[in-house]
């Protein structure tokens, strides 16, 4: 999920008056794209990758739903995944003074790394975190999926064992809040 990114900007005609301002802001965020990313983009835009995208979405959906199903509890508030590669669990009844301190404790106690909600503009005292669920061998998982609509929990356990282990550790840790 980490790595180099490439973006583009599409603006409806009725918002053209904002285009120069948007370009100026955008140039500070994602200009000077590195050469490997440019070559990858050319390849990506030339081919038909619809089956690939459906399969990858199916895998991320299955893994995300596994994380959601196994974390939601009276100690952890969490919404189901909606297309990203991370979830935003909120820890209830927390004894920590900030989401950053909460994440530090979780990392120390479980080995699970999360980002504090305060890194994303939430109030530091809100015990909201961001948890990525991409710690798995995507190539191996992809190779073993034949039907992206029916990825079982067993497949998630087999091909995303680090995610499964992390969710288990996090769930057990939260029971002591």
Protein language model features and the residues they cover:
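Conserved core segment of the aminotransferase class I/II
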Residues: 1-58, 68-69, 150-153, 167-168
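Generic structural signal for small/hydrophobic residues in well-ordered secondary structure
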Residues: 7, 41, 60, 87, ...
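Residue-level recognition of strand-loop junctions within catalytic nucleotide-signaling folds
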Residues: 12, 46, 90-92, 134-136
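Conserved glycine-rich beta-strand-loop-beta hairpin in the small C-terminal domain of fold type I
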Residues: 58-68, 78-91, 127
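Surface-exposed helix-capping loop/turn segments at secondary-structure junctions
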Residues: 71-79, 176-177
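A short linear hydrophobic-aromatic micro-motif
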Residues: 74-78, 113-118
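Short, conserved charged micro-motifs
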Residues: 95-101, 139-142
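PLP-dependent enzyme catalytic core of the Aspartate aminotransferase-like
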Residues: 105-114, 120-177
